């Protein structure tokens, strides 16, 4: 059995997959304890996109769209997460609307970080193109 479930959440052991890229899900997760890594795998090469810690959340996009998961999430060491489905999320937001604001704030930070990452790679790619043209 990959994980253990109790009333306070689900527990995962080191290396256990919480969900896989391209799987279908309608839940998000909040890390109660431990760390997870968010990864993409291409041609057998695993790239770590993020390391998330206690208090962080992941899988939230599945609450808002019908697309498959965009990455795989694995436990680093022992991890305990709280799983929240769409119905529970909407209930929590109706009781505490600031929850939605805090999530949007965190998602905005992630988008800004991704923008910076994409820009840095675009600059590197342009530099390579410029260098190769110098040798032509």
Question: Where is each model-derived feature located?
Answer:
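Cytosolic regulatory regions built on CNB/CRP/Popeye-like sensor folds
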Residues: 1-136
């Amino acid at each position: 059995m990959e994980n253990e479930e109790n009333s306070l959440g689900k527990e995962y052991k080191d290396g256990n997959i919480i969900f896989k890229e391209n799987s279908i899900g309608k839940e998000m997760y909040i890390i109660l304890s431990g760390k997870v890594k968010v990864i993409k795998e291409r041609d057998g090469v695993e790239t770590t996109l993020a390391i998330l810690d206690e208090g962080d959340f992941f899988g939230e996009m599945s609450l808002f769209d019908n697309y498959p998961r965009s990455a795989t999430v694995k436990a680093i060491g022992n991890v305990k997460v709280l799983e929240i489905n769409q119905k529970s999320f909407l209930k929590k937001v109706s009781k505490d609307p600031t929850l939605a604001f805090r999530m949007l704030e965190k998602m905005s930070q992630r988008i800004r970080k991704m923008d910076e990452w994409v820009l840095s790679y675009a600059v590197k790619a342009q530099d390579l193109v410029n260098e190769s043209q110098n040798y032509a």
